[in-house]
């Protein structure tokens, strides 16, 4: 039984929503954030990447960075750019990309559900990244970015959302430069809010699709606040974290591709020879190779594209993690052939989201005489199965598109 909680969102006025909305903090680097922020003083990146408003040499984890985030957030609220709703509401958030629509409900998930496994994880988190977001949440006294969750939606909840959309005007409706449309409806009727609470109480599991570090950080902030307030009731806002829950079958997972800077001292001939023990190799002259089925991948090396198909005897079909394409690549190529022991920390490997063209990967690989791998995307079914078994996926296994925008909903603690 999932606990889902309506809340009083701090959010932009309708005329400012498109300007405030920003990509998540962790998909833009410092230079990109600075460029966006310089052009748009209302961008929420001024809160999520506040180092852009400090000296260029400022350390990302300097206390002044977190103080600046708080200052920028307060300024936007004081100027009336962000306004808090007067009553607790749910919100419908719809994204449309290339004709495909995903529609979810924005509310707050319980930190207890996270700890007892109702909110399920599939990815390891890094302590340094957790500490960064803990400091950010503490300083802002708010969850500033939603956790991207998925579940098996009951038909009745889908019907409720569609009925509300059909009979109410959207609070926000705008299309960004990337041609992704964002729409938001505010659910403010007590009867409908109660019905949503009941619907979620009948849902057994919520799955983190994206945002493991933000979720872990929000939970740790909540637990710390409980220690500081031993008389807490469980109803305080710090007991909940900002989430958007989508039907799992509406989501689009793109591949998370890999580029290795070199061939680990091997010649191209020796490298290709090593692959033939575990893969069927086919030269694909003249065009980039994108795999069209599981256990296949495209590879670019030394000016040529290849199609790789894993031999069926190199993975255990019942091993939900081991049969993932990213696992096969790691265990049969990256570790034994290319010497990538830990993809979390090895500086020779980089990860490129599936929104980038295959030709871009080839160009990057050519710069250092390396190799690029174009993966087949992991499925939501595999993700949920792994989470249900309390197992972990390899790092950078999934790339979700479209990216949820930060700044449309802020949950004050």
Question: What does each model-identified segment do?
Answer:
Residues 1-413:
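Surface-exposed, charge/polar-rich loops and edge strands
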């Amino acid at each position: 039984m999932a606990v889902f909680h309506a809340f009083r969102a701090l959010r932009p006025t309708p005329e400012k929503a498109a300007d405030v909305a920003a990509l998540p903090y962790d998909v833009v680097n410092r230079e990109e954030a600075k460029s966006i922020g310089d052009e748009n003083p209302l961008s929420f990146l001024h809160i999520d990447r506040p180092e852009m408003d400090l000296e260029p040499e400022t350390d990302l984890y300097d206390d002044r960075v977190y103080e600046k985030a708080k200052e920028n957030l307060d300024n936007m609220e004081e100027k009336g750019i962000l306004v808090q709703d007067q009553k607790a509401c749910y919100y419908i958030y719809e994204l449309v990309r290339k004709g495909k629509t995903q529609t979810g409900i924005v509310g707050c998930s319980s930190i207890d559900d996270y700890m007892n496994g109702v909110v399920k994880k599939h990815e390891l988190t890094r302590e340094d990244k957790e500490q960064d977001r803990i400091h950010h949440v503490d300083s802002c006294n708010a969850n500033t970015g939603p956790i991207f969750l998925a579940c098996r939606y009951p038909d009745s909840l889908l019907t409720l959302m569609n009925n509300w959309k059909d009979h109410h005007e959207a609070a926000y409706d705008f299309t960004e430069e990337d041609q992704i449309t964002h729409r938001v409806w505010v659910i403010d009727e007590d009867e409908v809010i109660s019905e949503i609470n009941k619907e979620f109480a009948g849902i057994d599991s919520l799955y983190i699709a994206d945002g493991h570090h933000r979720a872990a950080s929000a939970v740790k902030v909540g637990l710390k606040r409980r220690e500081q307030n031993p008389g807490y009731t469980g109803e305080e806002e710090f007991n909940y974290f900002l989430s958007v829950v989508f039907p799992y079958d509406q989501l689009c997972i793109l591949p998370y591709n890999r580029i290795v800077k070199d061939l680990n001292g091997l010649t191209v001939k020796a490298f290709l020879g090593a692959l033939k023990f575990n893969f069927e190799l086919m030269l694909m002259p003249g065009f980039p190779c994108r795999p069209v089925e599981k256990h296949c991948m495209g590879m670019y090396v030394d000016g040529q594209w290849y199609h790789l198909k894993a031999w069926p005897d190199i993975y255990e079909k019942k091993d939900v993690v081991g049969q993932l394409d990213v696992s096969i690549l790691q265990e049969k190529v990256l570790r034994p052939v290319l010497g990538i022991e830990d993809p979390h920390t090895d500086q020779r490997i980089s990860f490129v989201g599936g929104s980038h063209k295959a030709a871009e990967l080839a160009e990057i690989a050519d710069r250092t005489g390396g190799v690029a791998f174009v993966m087949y995307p992991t499925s939501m079914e595999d993700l949920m199965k792994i989470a249900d078994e309390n197992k972990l996926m390899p790092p950078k296994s999934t790339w979700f598109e479209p990216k949820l925008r930060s700044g449309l909903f802020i949950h004050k603690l």
